[in-house]
Design a protein with these regions (language model features):
Chain C
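Periplasmic-binding protein-like
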Residues: 296, 300-340, 387-388, 488-496
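N-terminal lobe/hinge region of extracytoplasmic solute-binding protein
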Residues: 41-91, 119-122, 193
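Ligand/substrate-recognition segments at binding pockets and active sites
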Residues: 40, 246, 328, 361-432, ...
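Structural transition elements
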Residues: 198, 327-366, 380-385
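Ligand-site clamp/hinge motif
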Residues: 219-271, 282, 402
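Extracytoplasmic/peripheral linker and loop segments enriched in polar/acidic and small residues
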Residues: 353, 399, 404-413, 421, ...
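Gly/Pro-rich hinge or "lid" segments in bacterial periplasmic/extracellular proteins
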Residues: 78, 167-239, 247-248, 357-358, ...
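Surface-exposed binding/hinge segments that line
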Residues: 88, 99, 133-179, 186, ...
């Protein structure tokens, strides 16, 4: 077991290295000139050259790559071209709303997904099952940006239950800041719930077919105990896997909902950075997302191996 | 043959429904020029933002173009992009997956790279690539294929590995059959199922992601109709012309829904074991 | 006798009490006006807040509350001394002597004097592109005494004072505290000490700018009229929120989250009219949509080809496609609108707004156009640019001209347009409100970024332009203006398609708001 953990941790290194390479080259291969955007249309060639030099953008690509790599190992992600602050600082500031949205979406998704999945499995082939299948299918089929706009239209513009956009940080508004995050989280939760419901349902269906369940039934155990105590626990493994693997997708989803609801999180920051070629921020955002995904996956795999000693990485 | 036999054996509400919807969509997109007289890109700005009427079933957009027409052609675009992405993903993913599964030396290197690629949500890779290569249908197809093929490669690789050491393959090898023959005869046949299932889900994903990319402005170039771009355009007019945003959104949902249904149905049909084998940690999006 | 006295006394008393009550009421209303935090929604965010170091007009618009100029424009575009008390122009325009107001307080408590103005001016001259227009003609600035300054020119430059107050982009000259100018030099300023009715509080990039009332503000004694005259800070605090999405800006005002939103979709005008809580603010057509040619690349290095496109387009249809509701746009051929002293009534006659595809094709033949696709380069983020490009492509293709449409995000557009090849047509919104034709945003001379224009015709234009610069006599200058307009419509290095209005909206409880070319929030209060 310990060897497995060590092996996986060691594997992180080459993966993150490759991720860094990909992040750097993707960013710096994008056409578009941030310097001219900063200086405006009337900038002269000499002004452009001057700014390029002070930003270090006139160096050859390979050199910039190694300099950047050396810096990030030290934890220095450079300074944003537009936000006038070190990237690591900006990333840290924007982390909270994104995490809140992601966690809220995940929690909402898990609770409703589990519920829906269990209901479906227990009522296999009956109306409730069909209903749950259909609902979860819709969940994974609706484009998140469209859903966000629909929700905004109905609940914010027409009903006025939630603010349309923007964000007040926790420090200022306390729990009031959650008002701004509910619709974005719900948008993302739809898809999570759909995925989790589907996985739960199929895992439960398989488990419920097993012999030991039949034994428990014949023993006369109540349905509730069978479902929750035995079946659910043993179905959790694939569900947890699905949750873990979809966390990356969830993070990707925050980019879109943050943009639509104007929440100053890491996703909005990343999209803005791409739109105006804020190179240090783009690089950092890409690495950030990838690293989180890799770490979460590691977690999932480890807990997986932990919970099911039968499966091991070859 | 086995496929059809299995099909007739059980009831398949999912597959049937989804195939019906998909045939309908295919019909709409193929016969778009016949079904509507209007040109999807010709402007008629003096007639902008008209509500649905007899002349314009779904009204007109901000350029006076007939929305119904654009929806039909937009479906066609989504289908084209989805199909192209699926084909490319299957080819690339298949080749890489088979190579990795069959030749263990390759496997180590390839898997590391694939793992790293899969560390990014597909949409982010696609956005970045689209930003680099520029917008446009071809670039979107390439960008999405690039984002999806690692997953496909992985699936193929798993299938290959599970087959590779089976008895009948070993005996084929012992008898001196060439690698390529083995690959084609046994491996492809057995990985066909997971490939088909994943391909269907990729089709759905491609439609969603193309819409998202067009929404963000890095997708299909105007004036070509794209359902996602139509949603973007409609945002500004949402309150005065809600039909502009409802129609394309519903279309996207319909297309994606039916494809997901099909994928589910196929998976149930082809290999019930695939559903949630602990080894196969499949991701539906 | 006593009875009369009594009655008179009572009447007087009543009158006194009445007028006291009235005054108290008025005073109380004035008092009542004070207070509140204004939330305004703007569409773009800024990279920093230093107007000398950027061409972003939003920086100036916001910082107009923090900084003031020596001169400002009023609502009739009359140049008005603001931080200046008075001025004199001598020696045929070679010397300007400016007297400053003497008791104007800076945000740091000190009194503004010539040192502050001179330091700010030198910086403006060096960095700001308005200053760079002036610099080639300028000699030096001298301090006469603590409140008097002399500006000396090597060559007469008629637009000088107009540029100082310019409402275009970032061009305006503002007075900053000397200590800040010394501290930052040419680097981006992030500590702000000005003389304006509001002072800088906080800036969160991509989110908001917060300003709070400057309690010791010293207003001008002239009558308030847009940027000139007395500014009263009723609001305690002003928060500029950066909200790129138009619908979100709109929804914010509908729900009361914002009191003001700029640039909202004009198509929603009827909705706002119907809403009791929202007022429409239509800014009169102060924007032009310019069609800009790449004059260095075939086919548009030939003036016949350039003229051809003007004939090939149905301008009215473009109006509907680009802007929409006709109450928000109008066709206008001159660079200056009717009512502006520089308006030339018959500019572009015979070509502007004339839809003649046949003639267009003839002209293209005459120019030797080989049929290669024409590349239209435009930005995605601006509605006019985007919809205009799509509409123009459609119109040109309908008459058989091949067009390649390139819509990109702003950084890519900026990069591609700065090159001499690869694009043919570009659309850009220009500001129409220009008090002086020679600080016209589009007219900073030929061979600049907008035109890539370098030919016999461009040199002729340069000459006309130089003549105008030297001519101090208004009437003679206007004649030169007429020549310039007719030359512009003959060689057409670029042309304006139409003028359009922007629509802002505000909550009904925001009172006394005046819609000008840049939104400002002094003299306006919340009920």
């Amino acid at each position: 077991m310990r060897n497995y953990i060590i092996k996986r941790l060691l594997l992180l290194v080459p993966i993150i290295l490759i991720v860094a390479v990909i992040a750097f080259f993707i960013t710096n291969l994008m056409p578009g000139d941030p310097v001219r955007v900063i200086l405006g249309n009337m900038a002269t060639e000499s002004e452009v050259a001057r700014l390029e030099q002070s930003l270090g953008l006139d160096q050859p690509l390979i050199m910039r790559f190694f300099r950047w790599l050396a810096n990030i190992i030290k934890g220095d992600f450079g300074e944003s071209l537009y936000l006038n602050a070190p990237v690591s600082e900006v990333l840290f500031e924007r982390l909270r709303p994104t995490l809140f949205i992601a966690v809220m979406a995940e929690v909402m998704g898990i609770t409703s997904g589990l519920l829906l999945g269990i209901l479906a499995a227990v009522n296999h082939r009956k109306v409730l099952d069909q209903f749950s299948i259909t609902l979860s299918l819709f969940g994974i089929s609706i484009p998140s940006f469209w859903l966000a706009l629909m929700l905004m239209f109905v609940f914010s513009v027409n009903l006025g239950w939630f603010p349309v956009s923007g964000y007040e940080p926790f420090a200022e508004a306390g729990f009031g800041s959650f008002r701004y995050l509910i619709l974005p989280a719900v948008t993302l939760a739809f898809m999570q719930a759909g995925l989790i419901a589907r996985m739960t349902r199929s895992a439960m269906l398989d488990t419920l077919k097993q012999d030991y369940i039949r034994t428990a039934k014949s023993k006369g155990l109540s349905r509730k105990i069978i479902v929750f105590k035995h079946a659910l626990k043993n179905s959790m493994l694939p569900v947890i896997t699905v949750i873990g693997h979809n966390f990356a997708v969830l993070l990707g989803g925050t980019w879109i909902v943050e943009t639509i609801f104007v929440i100053p999180g890491t996703g909005f920051m990343a999209i803005n950075a791409i739109m105006r070629r804020d190179i240090p921020v783009i690089q950092a955002s890409i690495i950030f997302v990838a690293v989180i995904y890799v770490i979460i996956n590691l977690f999932v795999d480890l807990s997986y191996a932990f919970l099911n000693p039968k499966i091991r990485y070859h | 043959m086995l496929f059809l036999k299995k099909y007739k054996k059980y009831e398949h509400p999912y597959i049937t429904t989804s195939i019906i919807i998909l045939i309908l969509l295919a019909f709409l997109s193929l016969f778009a020029p016949v079904l509507t007289d209007y040109n999807p890109v010709r402007n008629d700005a003096r007639n902008r933002l008209q509500a649905p009427s007899r002349e314009h079933l779904l009204g007109t957009d901000q350029f006076g173009r007939d929305v119904f027409t654009r929806i039909l052609y937009g479906i066609r675009t989504s289908m084209e992009v989805g199909l192209a992405v699926v084909i490319l993903t299957v080819i690339f993913g298949g080749v890489v997956g088979i190579a990795a599964g069959y030749y263990p030396q390759l496997d180590k290197v390839v898997m590391r790279i694939l793992d790293a690629m899969m560390a990014f949500p597909g949409i982010i890779i696609a956005i970045s690539l689209a930003a680099i290569w520029g917008a446009g249908k071809l670039n979107i197809i390439l960008a999405l294929s690039f984002a999806y093929f690692p997953k496909m490669a992985r699936i193929v690789r798993s299938a290959v590995i599970s087959i590779k050491d089976l008895d009948y393959v070993d005996s084929a090898r012992a008898v001196g059959a060439k690698d390529s023959r083995i690959i084609f005869k046994y491996i492809l046949k057995n990985s066909a199922s997971p490939i088909m299932v994943q391909a269907t889900f990729n089709f759905a994903l491609a439609i969603l992601d193309e819409a998202a990319l067009s929404f963000l402005g890095v997708g299909i170039m105007p004036p070509a109709p794209s359902l996602g771009a139509m949603v973007t355009d409609a945002r500004t007019y949402m309150v005065v012309a809600p039909w502009l945003i409802l129609a394309p959104g519903i279309m996207i949902v319909l297309a994606v829904l039916s494809l997901n249904l099909l994928g589910d149905g196929l998976r149930d049909l082809l290999d019930p074991h695939l559903k949630n084998t602990l080894k196969n940690r499949e991701v539906k999006k | 006798m006593r009875k009369e006295i009594k009655i008179t006394a009572v009447v007087v008393l009543v009158a006194l009490v009445f007028s006291l009550l009235l005054t108290a009421n008025v005073l109380a209303q004035e008092e009542d006006r004070y207070g509140g935090t204004l939330n305004a929604a703007f569409q773009m965010s800024v990279a920093h807040l230093d107007s000398d170091n950027s061409t972003d007009s939003l920086i100036t618009a916001m910082m107009n509350h923090v900084y003031e100029g020596l001169f400002e424009f009023d609502e009739n575009l009359n140049l008005t001394p603001h931080l200046a008390e008075s001025y004199q122009v001598g020696e045929d325009g070679l010397v300007y002597e400016v007297k400053l107001r003497e008791n104007v307080k800076l945000h740091n408590g000190q009194t503004m004097d010539a040192d502050d103005v001179i330091a700010s001016f030198r910086r403006w001259l060096e960095l700001n592109n308005g200053g760079q227009l002036v610099a080639p003609y300028f000699d030096q600035v001298e301090k006469i005494d603590q409140f008097n300054i002399r500006f000396k020119f090597a060559e007469a430059y008629a637009p000088f004072l107009n540029i100082l107050a310019s409402p275009v982009s970032n061009q305006k000259f503002v007075v900053r505290a000397e200590e800040v100018v010394d501290e930052f030099g040419t680097d981006v300023i992030d500590r702000h000490v000005g003389t304006g009715p509001y002072k800088y509080e906080e800036w969160v990039p991509d989110q908001k700018l917060v300003l709070t009332r400057f309690e010791d503000y010293t207003p001008s004694s002239r009558e308030a009229s847009f940027f000139a005259g007395k500014r009263t800070a009723y609001l305690d605090e002003i928060v500029f929120n950066f909200i790129p999405d138009a619908q979100v800006r709109v929804s914010g005002v509908q729900t009361g989250q914002f009191h003001f939103a700029e640039e909202v979709p004009r198509d929603q005008y009827p909705l706002f009219e119907a809403n009791q809580n929202i007022d429409n603010v239509i800014i009169y057509p102060d924007r032009m949509s310019m069609l800009i040619y790449n004059n260095a690349e075939a086919p548009f290095d030939n003036k016949y080809a350039r003229q051809a496109i003007a004939y090939a387009l149905d301008f009215e249809e473009l109006g509907y496609a680009m802007i929409g509701d006709p109450q928000f746009w109008r066709l206008e051929s001159a660079l200056h609108e009717e009512g502006n002293p520089w308006h030339v009534p018959d500019a572009g006659e015979g070509i502007y707004g004339v839809y003649d595809p046949e003639k267009a094709k003839e002209l293209l033949d005459q120019a030797g156009y080989d049929g290669d696709p024409i590349v239209i380069l435009s930005g995605q983020d601006n509605q006019m640019e985007r919809q205009g490009a799509i509409a123009i492509q459609d119109q040109l293709e309908e008459i058989g001209i091949d067009v390649e449409l390139q819509l990109f995000d702003r950084p890519t557009v900026v990069e591609r347009r700065s090159k001499k090849e690869g694009w043919h047509i570009h659309l850009s919104p220009f500001i129409k409100i220009v008090p002086d034709p020679q600080i016209h945003q589009g007219w900073t001379g030929t061979n600049k970024w907008i035109s890539n224009w370098d030919s016999e015709e461009s040199r002729e234009m340069d000459q006309i332009f130089a003549e105008m610069l030297r001519e101090v006599d208004q009437e003679k200058r206007y004649e030169i203006m007429e020549r310039m307009q007719s030359k512009l419509w003959d060689s057409v290095p670029y042309f304006n398609i139409l003028d359009y209005s922007r629509l802002h909206i505000k909550r009904a409880e925001l009172k006394d708001f005046k819609g000008s070319w840049q939104p400002f929030f002094w003299n306006t209060y919340l009920e």
